[in-house]
A protein has these predicted regions:
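Active-site-adjacent loop and "lid" segments of alpha/beta metabolic enzymes
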Residues: 1-30, 85, 100-117, 136-165, ...
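N-terminal accessory interaction module
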Residues: 1-79
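Glycine-rich, aromatic-flanked loop segments that form ligand/cofactor-binding clefts
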Residues: 73-91
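Flexible glycine-/small-residue-enriched beta->alpha junction loops
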Residues: 97
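Catalytic domains of carbohydrate-active enzymes, especially glycoside hydrolases
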Residues: 116-132, 324
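Histidine-rich, glycine-flanked metal-binding segment
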Residues: 57-69, 104-120
């Protein structure tokens, strides 16, 4: 059990109006909270925001975590495109693999059709398209980097030509290099730059944003390792250490996005604990990506629903992430997720408008 202090925002409210000094804004987004769950050495207690200043004055880590949690995340300028993290964004998943668990490899043989599917997701509201050429399902075979490059580069080139923002979902430096040369703007690595010794160098040289995803033992693959004492704290500490390591190697901290790795080397109970405690991860000071779309946990909680019948569960998990202040949702079902976000945004706007009107009376 770690002896470090951790802060998890809790007790969320609809509006900050009339609550000066009693609530704090979460990461510059559309959520406000009234207290922290403070954990240290396995012990937890609740500290209201109104009383937090005293704790911050005597504990440097508490002050630093509070600053990270409440600071707005800087926008990412990617060519003529800008990703702003003051409200949730959607990343559309585009797999070009023969053994994809979600689409059965339908797009692997036809780069033009794959790119068209990506453009369609962008039209439906995806801020970027995440292109992957290697399956990360459990027991999936390792793909030779040359084959992976052949799968993804023609698709990325077409997407970029259409004006679509692209991230490359890979753990291999050679694939990162080829994808970035083809116009991809972001690296999304399920190994958090661990798998390939050259990966960090590629990201540093490109100066591109990178998604660092947690898995217990990335050198063994995305599903290597298992077993946690406190999964939420351990994932936080792992990502905190990984961020420090890649920043020391030259990665710009303002260009790091973190992903808790739902479904990667984690049991159903681990995944549920992570989702219920997601707000803790804002203490890392980075935008958070959540990839829970169509995951096995949805089937486990819904009478073993097959992959193509997990839309409801995917939306439920996306909304859980949104309520926790997640900035980027990685999903298969873009139109439905975007609609859910718009309805959520309408509810938020209505609560704020009503509170301002009441305050002016």
């Amino acid at each position: 059990m770690t002896g470090k202090l951790h802060l998890r925002p809790i007790q969320f409210v609809d509006t900050p109006v009339g609550r000066d000094g009693e609530v704090a804004r979460l990461a510059g987004g559309m959520a406000w909270f009234a207290a922290y769950e403070v954990s240290k050495g396995g012990k937890r207690r609740t500290v209201p925001i109104a009383e937090f200043e005293a704790l911050a004055a005597r504990d440097e880590r508490a002050a630093r975590l509070h600053a990270a949690i409440t600071s707005a995340r800087p926008a990412l300028t990617l060519g003529d495109r800008t990703l702003r993290f003051d409200q949730p964004l959607v990343a559309g998943i585009l797999n070009v693999t023969p053994d994809s668990f979600s689409d059965g490899g339908k797009l692997q043989e036809d780069p033009a059709a794959a790119a068209a599917a990506g453009v369609d997701m962008a039209v439906k509201g995806a801020a970027l398209i995440d292109v992957g050429g290697e399956s990360t399902r459990p027991k999936a075979p390792l793909v030779w980097e040359g084959d992976e490059i052949k799968r993804v580069v023609p698709v990325i080139e077409r997407l970029v030509k259409s004006g679509t923002l692209v991230s490359t979902d890979t753990r291999k430096a050679a694939v990162m290099e080829a994808a970035l040369a083809a116009g991809a703007a972001i690296v999304n690595d399920v190994s958090a730059l661990y798998w390939d010794d050259r990966s960090t160098e590629i990201v540093v040289r490109a100066g591109c944003p990178v998604v660092l995803m947690h898995s217990p033992d990335p050198k063994k693959g995305p599903h290597g390792g298992d077993g946690y004492g406190d999964v939420l704290i351990e994932v936080f500490d792992w990502l905190e250490a990984r961020i420090a390591a890649v920043v020391a190697a030259g990665v710009d901290p303002a260009k790091i996005i973190v992903d808790p790795g739902i479904g990667f080397g984690k049991s159903l109970q681990d995944n549920l604990a992570l989702l219920n405690g997601l707000t803790l991860l804002h203490g890392l000071g980075c935008p958070i990506m959540l990839g829970a779309s169509r995951k096995r946990m949805i089937g486990a909680l819904s009478n073993e629903a097959p992959v193509d019948a997990r839309l409801g569960g995917s939306i439920a998990l996306a909304m859980k992430g949104i309520e926790a202040g997640v900035q980027l949702l990685r999903v298969h079902d873009v139109a439905e997720t975007v609609q859910a976000i718009r309805v959520w945004r309408g509810l938020k706007d209505a609560a704020l408008t009503l509170s301002f009107e009441r305050a002016s009376l």
